[in-house]
């Protein structure tokens, strides 16, 4: 039992999917079970492994980046080509609150603490070679919002932040969900704003990068966030690429996230 995490259940490696395992654990933050898809590269052996926590979007779950995004296959390919160093990837569910939790706190349900506390603690307990003192956060769409906001809020615990096609305000979820969740999540409180936390923790922020497709309905919000960060003189990288809000775009550009993690992890290891 780790910090209230009881009886984690870990699968064997999934046949035909090297390095992929499925994990279910009791989460104190969620007050229920939570699911995680894990990828640990075979080439790592017992060497210390940085941890990337990769978040999904609305209507999704922990298996999305594996089954729809081919994340483990892309990572294996890049590792074999020498493009990245080995690191672990945890792909958790958002807690499965309604159509999407926004990775924020609801009544009796703390999706934020699930991501920054419970997931790293359980992964570390099961795989002691995984380093969790500082983790990398990344995600797509709603998961991009989660990575940017949680990463900025918990800046001292995060080594790098990357987002693809990010929701930049919770109100933007109205364009994706069909029930009252958007209204519930879209309270204009400062705690829910990316820019609020980036300003609050500007001197402690890790490296930040994000991108968006030029045919994505969220492009305007990403441009606005980029402009706001420039005005606030908060260092970051922003890019636009041809493409929409779909898996074709995310499969292509998650490679940038993997390189980003590898470069930072390599620099940290060299110090």
What are these regions (language model features)?
Residues 1-271:
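Non-catalytic cap/lid and distal C-terminal segments of serine-dependent acyl enzymes
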């Amino acid at each position: 039992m780790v910090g209230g995490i009881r009886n984690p259940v870990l699968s064997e490696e999934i046949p035909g999917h090297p390095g992929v395992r499925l994990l279910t654990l009791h989460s104190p933050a969620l007050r229920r079970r939570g699911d995680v898809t894990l990828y640990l590269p075979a080439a790592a052996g017992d060497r210390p492994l940085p941890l990337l926590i990769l978040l999904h979007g609305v209507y999704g779950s922990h298996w999305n980046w594996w089954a729809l995004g081919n994340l483990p296959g892309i990572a294996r390919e890049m590792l074999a080509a020498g493009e990245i160093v080995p690191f672990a990837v945890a792909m958790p569910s958002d807690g499965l609150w309604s159509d999407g939790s926004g990775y924020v706190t609801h009544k009796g349900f703390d999706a934020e603490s699930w991501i920054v506390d419970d997931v790293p603690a359980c992964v570390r307990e099961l795989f002691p070679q995984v380093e969790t003192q500082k983790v990398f956060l990344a995600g797509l769409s709603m998961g991009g919002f989660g990575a940017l906001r949680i990463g900025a809020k918990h800046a001292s615990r995060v080594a790098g932040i990357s987002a693809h096609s990010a929701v930049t305000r919770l109100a933007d979820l109205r364009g994706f969900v069909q029930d009252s969740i958007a209204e519930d999540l879209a309270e204009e409180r400062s705690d829910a704003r990316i820019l609020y936390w980036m300003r609050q923790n500007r001197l402690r922020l890790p490296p930040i990068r994000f991108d968006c497709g030029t045919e994505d309905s969220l492009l305007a919000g990403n441009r606005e966030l980029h402009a706001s960060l420039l005005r606030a003189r908060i260092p970051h990288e922003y890019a636009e690429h041809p493409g929409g809000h779909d898996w074709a775009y995310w499969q292509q550009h998650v490679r940038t996230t993997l390189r980003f993690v590898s470069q930072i992890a390599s620099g940290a290891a060299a110090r």
